From Swiss-Prot:
Keywords: Cytoplasm, DNA-binding, Transcription, Transcription regulation. This is Probable transcriptional regulatory protein Ccel_0181. It comes from the Bacteria. Its main location: cytoplasm. GO terms for molecular function: DNA binding. GO terms for cellular component: cytosol. InterPro entries: Integrase-like_N, TACO1_YebC-like_2nd/3rd_dom, TACO1_YebC_N, Transcrip_reg_TACO1-like, Transcrip_reg_TACO1-like_dom3, YebC-like. Signal peptide: none annotated. Belongs to the TACO1 family. It is found in: Cytoplasm.
Length: 248
């Protein structure tokens, strides 16, 4: 267990923005729409849709909502035409930030992002300015409980093709190559495991610690503001938060 990603330390805990379930489901519905448009409405033949559905389930999206989103995407009745686009920038203290967005208006999205980066002491950069500081990996997180045996889970994950396995006080973390993510996730799902997280993510190769109280405050507000934007699906960053900062 190398622990190279330290997911629990670098991924912001689901905060006030993600507490609004309707907002999460709206964002996931957009991801479903794009997946259906790219590969059809049948998850058995559309691996992207299958992965999005797994992400929906990890976020406790009811199956009825998932199926309605797929049907709506198949019909394209509302005329919306969403696309996926990634923006990059720097937060306070040079923290690298990546925002994965699903939008029907690039200008609106870029304007909203720029506003918050500027407001909280960062700046929106050019494409590629920070992405080289991250590795794209599949991430599966399983809660620790009496039903899960750590050694068994580790062996089953590695046998299915996982690259790495780690754990902390609360959960187990499984890292995969993006190409192997679906295979590993499906193998563990078939064995009855339930996931807290199950998605392809961006993991920083190095992290940045902030010591200035104002920078810490602004960085926290920046992430919260970005996550709260309807167009933003995922926010990744290189900020290594102390436990006391995560709890605030």
């Amino acid at each position: 267990m190398s622990g190279h990603s330290k997911w629990a330390n670098i991924k912001r805990q689901k905060g006030a923005a993600d507490a609004v379930r309707g907002k999460i489901f709206t964002k996931l519905g957009r991801e479903i729409q794009i997946a259906v448009r790219m590969g059809g409405a049948d998850p058995s033949s559309n691996s992207k849709l299958k992965d999005v559905i797994a992400k929906c389930k990890a976020n406790n999206m009811p199956n009825d909502n998932i199926q309605r989103s797929i049907k709506r995407a198949s019909g394209e009745t509302d005329g919306s035409n969403y696309e996926e686009i990634t923006y990059e920038g720097y937060g306070p203290g040079g923290v690298a930030v990546i925002c994965e967005c699903t939008t029907d208006n690039r200008n609106r999205t870029a304007g909203d992002l720029r506003h918050y980066f500027d407001k909280f002491g960062g700046n929106l950069g050019q494409s590629g300015c920070v992405s080289y500081m991250f590795n794209k990996k599949g991430v599966i997180v399983i809660e620790k409980n009496d039903k899960v045996n750590e050694e068994t889970l580790m062996m089953e994950a590695l046998d299915a093709g996982a690259e790495d396995f780690d754990s902390d006080d609360n959960c187990y973390e499984i890292i995969t190559d993006p190409a192997d993510f679906s295979t590993v996730r499906e193998a563990l799902e078939a064995k009855g495991y339930e996931f807290i997280e199950a998605e392809v993510s961006m993991i920083p190769t190095t992290t940045t610690k902030l010591t200035d109280p104002e920078q810490i405050k602004f960085m926290d507000k920046l992430i919260e503001a970005l996550e709260d934007l309807d167009d933003v699906s995922n926010v990744y960053h290189s900020w290594e938060q102390d436990e006391e900062n995560e709890e605030e």
